[in-house]
């Protein structure tokens, strides 16, 4: 009797999890599909990959390495302007060489399948800021602009569990912990040639601006806009309305 009850409970739990995951997937996809966008949810290099492409796409696009559907007002505004949106889920990876190679493969796929530009706007929210900065530093020719929102820029000043996990991942990739711990200080100079917009909450206790992006030497930045939100914490990300961010990302880059 107990075994039958256990099996029934297990089956019910499985069905509930399946239904919940389906509803969760549909909850962000359906509005885009209803508006006529092409939505693809696939797997690239073993990671979840998402593309949202308007009918009259202009080839420009914005992509993020984490947080599908979260604080998406900038993405939505750009979609209305003919931009496309992409995500490669690297949430629990910390910009290891393998993760960066996967993102390059993701960008190549978007270019080949949808005609998206070889240069992408990287959207780094919170932990996504770390990946965006490392990738832009290593692949500046593949990045059009950076939109960083409450960005984690120096992992050594974050929570211990994340520092440990990141250090383990980098060491497994053959990168010594000493280099990982000085990476933010030593390796972000090359991003100064990219247009960058940074939005942050002035009362953010999780990723304080003055301990993160605010520690960088910003002299020599080609095009930099920093917007602080008085009295705002780590959330909400973005701005309301988000026109200032959209204008910065959409304006031409003059070489």
PLM region spans:
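Bacterial N-terminal signal peptides
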Residues: 11-21
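N-terminal cap/lid segment of alpha/beta-hydrolase-fold proteins
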Residues: 26-57
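Short beta-strand element of the alpha/beta-hydrolase
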Residues: 58-67
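Short amphipathic alpha-helix adjacent to the substrate-entry channel of hydrolases
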Residues: 70-86
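Alpha/beta-hydrolase active-site loop
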Residues: 94-115, 134
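Primarily recognizes the serine-hydrolase "nucleophile elbow" in alpha/beta-hydrolase
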Residues: 119-172
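The feature captures the conserved acid-bearing segment of alpha/beta-hydrolase catalytic domains
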Residues: 156-220
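C-terminal catalytic histidine-bearing segment of alpha/beta-hydrolase fold enzymes
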Residues: 210-255
């Amino acid at each position: 009797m107990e075994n039958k009850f256990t099996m029934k409970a297990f089956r019910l739990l499985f069905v509930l999890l399946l239904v919940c995951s389906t509803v969760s997937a549909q909850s962000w996809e359906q509005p885009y599909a209803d508006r006529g966008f092409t939505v693809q949810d696939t797997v690239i290099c073993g990671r979840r990959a998402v593309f949202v492409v308007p009918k009259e796409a202009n080839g420009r696009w914005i992509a993020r390495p984490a947080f599908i559907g979260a604080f998406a007002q900038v993405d939505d505004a750009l979609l209305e302007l003919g931009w496309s949106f992409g995500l490669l889920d690297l949430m629990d990876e910390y910009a290891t060489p393998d993760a960066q190679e996967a993102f390059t493969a993701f960008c190549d796929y978007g270019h080949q399948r949808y005609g998206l530009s070889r240069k992408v706007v990287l959207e780094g929210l919170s932990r996504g800021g770390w990946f965006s900065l490392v990738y832009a530093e290593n692949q500046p020719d593949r990045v059009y602009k950076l939109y960083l929102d409450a960005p984690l820029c120096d992992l050594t000043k974050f929570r211990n569990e994340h520092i440990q996990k990141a250090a383990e991942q980098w060491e497994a990739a053959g990168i010594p912990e000493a280099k990982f711990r000085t990476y933010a200080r030593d390796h972000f100079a090359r991003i100064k040639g990219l247009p960058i917009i940074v939005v942050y909450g002035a009362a953010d206790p999780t990723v304080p601006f003055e301990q993160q992006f605010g520690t960088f030497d910003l002299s020599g930045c080609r095009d930099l806009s920093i917007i602080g939100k008085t009295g705002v914490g780590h959330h909400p990300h973005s701005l309301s309305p988000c026109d200032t961010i959209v204008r910065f990302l959409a304006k031409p880059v003059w070489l």
